[in-house]
Amino acid sequence: MVDFILNAQVRSDLGKGASRRLRRNAAQVPAVIYGGDKEPQSVTLELREIAKLLENEAAFSHVIALNVGGAKETVLIKALQRHPAKGFVMHADFLRVVADHKLTAHVPLHFINEDVAVGVKQAGGEISHTISEVEVSCLPKDLPEFIEVDMAKVELGQIVHLSDLKAPKGVELVQLAHGNDLAVANIHASRVVKEEGSEEGAAE
């Protein structure tokens, strides 16, 4: 499952000073590729190219074809360091992907049917999201772009947990496997309803 392509060059000038010069003078981003029983490799990326890639949310949960000076590496984005004020990427970590080895990755949650949820449509409640992504473990071929959270049947006061999610075949939710059935979302009484109830009580 390779839908994204990124170009990189082997980096020989290492160190913090060299990294600063890359970002300042050449609009390039230092990065490292590791894992897969190979030595870590330092590379550089074009800032404009990786910024364009990251405009697509799916890039974070997809296998990426990284072309390094003519050689191809199949990787996942493992970590990004961003500028604290401006938000642009300052450094990237990529994990090599091996087809027959399980990997772990963070996958976004997509909440559906929120406007027709029982607790919203019938009881006037509001939905709160506790988490926006989950860590999964699977083979590279099974890595999902996202996992859906169907809110249609969720009632007022009800909490949706990891155990309520339907993970695709071959995909394991890491926290759930470790016994942590985290809350994902809930429907609670809206502030307007609460305030109206308080006013009515005071009037009586």
Curated annotation (Swiss-Prot):
<keyword id="KW-0694">RNA-binding</keyword>
<dbReference type="InterPro" id="IPR011035">
    <property type="entry name" value="Ribosomal_bL25/Gln-tRNA_synth"/>
</dbReference>
<comment type="similarity">
    <text>Belongs to the bacterial ribosomal protein bL25 family. CTC subfamily.</text>
</comment>
<dbReference type="InterPro" id="IPR020056">
    <property type="entry name" value="Rbsml_bL25/Gln-tRNA_synth_N"/>
</dbReference>
<comment type="function">
    <text>This is one of the proteins that binds to the 5S RNA in the ribosome where it forms part of the central protuberance.</text>
</comment>
<dbReference type="GO" id="GO:0003735">
    <property type="term" value="F:structural constituent of ribosome"/>
</dbReference>
<keyword id="KW-0699">rRNA-binding</keyword>
<protein>
    <recommendedName>
        <fullName>Large ribosomal subunit protein bL25</fullName>
    </recommendedName>
</protein>
<keyword id="KW-0687">Ribonucleoprotein</keyword>
<dbReference type="InterPro" id="IPR029751">
    <property type="entry name" value="Ribosomal_L25_dom"/>
</dbReference>
<dbReference type="InterPro" id="IPR020930">
    <property type="entry name" value="Ribosomal_uL5_bac-type"/>
</dbReference>
<comment type="subunit">
    <text>Part of the 50S ribosomal subunit; part of the 5S rRNA/L5/L18/L25 subcomplex. Contacts the 5S rRNA. Binds to the 5S rRNA independently of L5 and L18.</text>
</comment>
<dbReference type="GO" id="GO:0008097">
    <property type="term" value="F:5S rRNA binding"/>
</dbReference>
<keyword id="KW-0689">Ribosomal protein</keyword>
<dbReference type="GO" id="GO:0022625">
    <property type="term" value="C:cytosolic large ribosomal subunit"/>
</dbReference>
<dbReference type="InterPro" id="IPR020057">
    <property type="entry name" value="Ribosomal_bL25_b-dom"/>
</dbReference>
<dbReference type="GO" id="GO:0006412">
    <property type="term" value="P:translation"/>
</dbReference>
<dbReference type="Pfam" id="PF01386">
    <property type="entry name" value="Ribosomal_L25p"/>
</dbReference>
<dbReference type="InterPro" id="IPR001021">
    <property type="entry name" value="Ribosomal_bL25_long"/>
</dbReference>
<dbReference type="InterPro" id="IPR037121">
    <property type="entry name" value="Ribosomal_bL25_C"/>
</dbReference>
<dbReference type="Pfam" id="PF14693">
    <property type="entry name" value="Ribosomal_TL5_C"/>
</dbReference>
